[in-house]
């Protein structure tokens, strides 16, 4: 009889945001598959949970599949987590979920924190429809093309970005999307949480004045204005 794959959302900054069900899922799993065993190990230690950990990240997901699928088909319960938030959203795990479901292994979501939704609801921008596009490409030419794809979309747009590329991404977003309302959310749920609201041009100027921001960043951009 197959085991079960639990897709467990974990805190994006504040450990108190882990749900009782999430904690129970981690405590009851036979194995925790995670991006960084050190990071997840520290979180589990703070929760008083001691479980075997197996790294699962973008560079080894295909190589890990046989081992994890064998565990699931042998009846083991595997909890899948990312470093923070809900797995699969710009994080590894999709291949595992797809293959497990295709083999008849039960897959359950244990919902909880999500940087995407947290940033969206505090952005003061229309919450739906929205499109989450993940991280822009690191190279300038591809990044410009990436933003251009969304220039006429009448959805609120949500992007992740690393602090050291934020200024360049804002330059390209202004060039391709125009100067429309936007919000930058950083260090969500943490002590130094900050939400910057304005237009893309105003946010670009603020980042240029302050220098590189610290912490994870979510950029939320208003829908394209009506044509004409």
Positions of PLM-derived features:
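Class I SAM-dependent methyltransferase SAM-binding "motif I" and its flanking Rossmann-like core
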Residues: 95-153
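Short acidic active-site motifs
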Residues: 63-68, 142-146
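Short active-site oxyanion
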Residues: 26-32, 104-108, 156-157
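Glycine/small-residue-rich loop that forms an oxyanion/phosphate-binding "nest" at active or ligand-binding sites
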Residues: 57, 65-114
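A contiguous loop/helix-start segment that scaffolds small-molecule binding in enzyme catalytic cores
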Residues: 2, 76-77, 156, 160-228
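Alpha-helix capping/helix-boundary segments
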Residues: 38-40, 85-86, 115, 165, ...
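Conserved helicase motor
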Residues: 55-62, 136-140
């Amino acid at each position: 009889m197959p085991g079960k794959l639990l897709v467990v959302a974990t805190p994006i900054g504040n450990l108190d945001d882990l749900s009782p069900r999430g904690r129970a899922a981690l405590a009851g799993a036979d194995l925790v598959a995670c991006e960084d065993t050190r990071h997840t190990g520290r979180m589990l230690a703070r929760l008083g949970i001691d479980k075997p950990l197996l790294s699962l990240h973008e560079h080894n997901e295909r190589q890990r599949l046989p081992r994890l699928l064998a565990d699931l088909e042998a009846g083991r319960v595997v909890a899948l987590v990312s470093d923070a938030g809900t797995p699969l959203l710009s994080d590894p795990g999709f291949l595992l979920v797809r293959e497990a479901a295709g083999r008849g292994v039960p897959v359950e979501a244990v919902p909880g924190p999500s940087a995407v939704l947290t940033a969206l609801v505090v952005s003061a921008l229309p919450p739906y429809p929205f499109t989450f596009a993940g991280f822009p490409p690191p190279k300038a030419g591809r990044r410009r093309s990436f933003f251009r794809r969304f220039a006429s979309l009448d959805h609120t747009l949500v992007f992740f970005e690393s602090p050291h590329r934020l200024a360049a991404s804002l330059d390209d977003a202004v060039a391709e999307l125009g100067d429309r309302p936007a919000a930058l959310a950083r260090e969500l749920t943490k002590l130094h949480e900050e939400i910057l609201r304005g237009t893309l041009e105003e946010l670009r100027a603020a980042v240029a004045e302050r220098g590189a921001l610290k912490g994870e960043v979510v950029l939320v951009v208003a829908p394209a204005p009506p044509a004409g």
